[in-house]
Amino acid sequence: MESIQLINIGFGNIVSANRVIAIVSPESAPIKRIITDARDRGQLVDATYGRRTRAVIITDSSHVVLSAIQPETVAHRFVVSKEAHANSN
């Protein structure tokens, strides 16, 4: 059985590291389109607490999560989480 790895994406919000496909910046037109499409489908999770969106997390279930922390910070937490899991086995 695979253990659940979690990543803090800011303000006490957590996502499953096992479900993350991509962590991207929200500035490009294709990413803005992905956000709009997810909102229309009801699969957008806004975890920014009213702050500016700095990272967009795309999951394998087609959910899109908006975060107010930088993509590099989320990616670093992702890597640290994976390394900690590898060292515990």
Swiss-Prot record:
<comment type="similarity">
    <text>Belongs to the RemA family.</text>
</comment>
<dbReference type="InterPro" id="IPR007169">
    <property type="entry name" value="RemA-like"/>
</dbReference>
<dbReference type="Pfam" id="PF04025">
    <property type="entry name" value="RemA-like"/>
</dbReference>
<protein>
    <recommendedName>
        <fullName>Putative regulatory protein PCC8801_0196</fullName>
    </recommendedName>
</protein>
